[in-house]
């Protein structure tokens, strides 16, 4: 009987060790859980960025206002008869 109890105790200790410290144990679970959370956060940022880019593409495909806005902001172009005025911030 004593041998059986010692055997069960050793088996329980072995199972507990593998649960806490072994492959796919609690430590791996917590590490992977935090990695998944950070990846989900990164994915949310990328989804938002993709939605903005998709909206820009649709605006460029459907109308001239988006093209005109980009030409003004990125290339510094102006329409005929317009006067371009740039206000610079005061130096400190």
UniProtKB/Swiss-Prot annotation:
**Keywords for this protein:** Cell cycle, Cell division, Cell inner membrane, Cell membrane, Coiled coil, Membrane, Transmembrane, Transmembrane helix
Q: Outline which residue ranges sit on the Periplasmic face.
A: 22-92
- One short Pfam name that applies is DivIC
The subcellular localization recorded is: Cell inner membrane
Is Transferase one of the keywords?
Answer: no
Q: Would you kindly state one Gene Ontology biological process term found in this protein's UniProt entry?
A: FtsZ-dependent cytokinesis
Pull the Cytoplasmic topological domain ranges from the record: 1-3
InterPro entries registered for this protein in UniProt: Cell_div_FtsB, FtsL/DivIC
Q: Which residues form a coiled coil?
A: 40-73
Gene Ontology, cellular component aspect: cell division site; cell septum; plasma membrane
Q: How does it sit in the membrane?
A: Single-pass type II membrane protein
Superkingdom of source: Bacteria
- Regions crossing the membrane: 4-21
Q: What is its main location?
A: membrane
User: What is its quaternary makeup?
Assistant: Part of a complex composed of FtsB, FtsL and FtsQ.
Q: Which HAMAP family match?
A: FtsB
The function of this protein is:
Essential cell division protein. May link together the upstream cell division proteins, which are predominantly cytoplasmic, with the downstream cell division proteins, which are predominantly periplasmic.
Similarity field: Belongs to the FtsB family.
Q: What is this protein called?
A: Cell division protein FtsB
């Amino acid at each position: 009987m004593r041998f059986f109890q010692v055997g069960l105790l050793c088996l329980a200790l072995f199972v507990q060790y593998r649960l806490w410290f072994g492959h796919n144990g609690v430590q791996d679970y917590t590490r992977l859980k935090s990695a998944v959370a950070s990846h989900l956060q990164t994915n949310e940022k990328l989804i938002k960025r993709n939605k903005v880019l998709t909206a820009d593409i649709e605006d460029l495909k459907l109308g001239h206002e988006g093209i005109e806005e980009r030409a003004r902001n990125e290339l510094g172009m102006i329409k005929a008869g317009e006067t371009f005025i740039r206000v610079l911030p005061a130096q400190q």
